[in-house]
Amino acid sequence: MSQLFYNNETISRIIKSQFDMALSHYGDIKYAYMVLNKKKPTEILIISNHHDEWREIYQANNYQHIDPVVIAALNKITPFPWDEDLLVSTQLKMSKIFNLSREHNITNGYTFVLHDHSNNLVMLSIMIDESNVSNIDDVIESNKDKLQMTLMTIHAETISLYREMIRNKEDERSNDKDIFSQRENEILYWASMGKTYQEIALILDIKTGTVKFHIGNVVKKLGVLNAKHAIRLGIELQLIRPVQS
């Protein structure tokens, strides 16, 4: 399985919070961030602020195989609206996926597309209900370049976090004696020295989200409530190895 499709809950929370923050500037927007393995379309990652039921039904039924938006996006490199031409061209106007969409008050939308270097189809779909079509359409048209850049930037963060997860697992396999991976230890060490997440990210040349991801793993490993408890316990039990600056 490709590294992006492990559906790590911590990573999904981080990515969702980044989309929530980035898209909040444009109003009350419902969105779905989707990553599809083009070589193996059953592998799919969906992060959304829409109803969990919608996402669960979509994934359980593998609706990506019949979704007109996905089918259209496979052959596009620029953003596109969900219009009548899309429905006609895919010949799926009465498909199950549109029945599902109507049930969850999704009547229109706009999708931003990215084809990444790992052969994944990456989409950010803005979902629009009937009561807010004109307002959201105007916002999207005025900010298409910014929304496309948002997708590119946050997808790069997704890739970075999953690479760190894989590296973390490899570190654990290579050194079973240490409770923390090399990266976790580095982050915990600098945190114990009073550095903020932003400062640690600069020191280690990684993203702030990556720091938060590893701190989350440390908290789980130690069975404590939060990062402050983890740092204090790491110091008290001498679990943190010195790091050369």
From Swiss-Prot:
Annotated GO MF terms: DNA binding
The entry's keywords: Activator, DNA-binding, Quorum sensing, Transcription, Transcription regulation, Virulence
Pfam families noted in UniProt: Autoind_bind, GerE
Biological-process GO terms, alphabetical: quorum sensing; regulation of DNA-templated transcription
Keyword DNA-binding: yes
Gene3D superfamilies: Transcription factor LuxR-like, autoinducer-binding domain, Winged helix-like DNA-binding domain superfamily/Winged helix DNA-binding domain
DNA-binding region: 197-216
Chain ranges of the HTH luxR-type domain: 173-238
Described purpose of this protein according to its UniProt entry: Functions as an OHLL responsive transcriptional regulator that acts in virulence (soft rot disease) through the activation of genes for plant tissue macerating enzymes.
Family, similarity comment: Belongs to the autoinducer-regulated transcriptional regulatory protein family.
Protein's name according to its UniProt entry: Transcriptional activator protein ExpR
